[in-house]
Amino acid sequence: VGFCPYRIYWKNKNNMNSNKLKDLVLQNYETEWKNYDAIIGEPISIGGTKIIKVIKYGKLAILRNPKAIFSRSGQTIRWQFDMFHGSGNLDKAIELLPNKDRDDFKHFTRNETSFSRGNMFISKSPKIINLYFRDVFDWLKSCEGIFGFNLEGYGKIRMYAFLAERYL
């Protein structure tokens, strides 16, 4: 079972012009995947944001984290989220996480410069899938009380998807 809003990641690239569903989705998997309960996508780096984007979107993010201008290590998940999805919104959402996840996720977002894009995973374990969906949707429901649904702009309209993507 997998969950991903970006369908391009799960398509069979050799048959992209086919109209048959079975030709468009992965039919086989890497042999080494048998050794794992869950597989997540390769992480992408968020460092190296063009200066024009920082100037356009990131003024408040720079005020919160000025070292991001001088060092890629300062361009953390938190910095990138502040820049594109509203300054401070990630911190507000993190405060709504259960205690068991809050500190680790806060540390992750303030120190890491890459994450597994697409909120995608494959798992053979119903327990893992159910726990993940329970935790992420309970958290997102709590976030609705703060952010609501009257959000404007691409980065804010899709904020719930972007929160879940970082949580994975």
List the model feature ranges, each with a label.
Residues 1-168:
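ER/Golgi luminal nucleotide-sugar-dependent glycosyltransferases, focusing on the catalytic module
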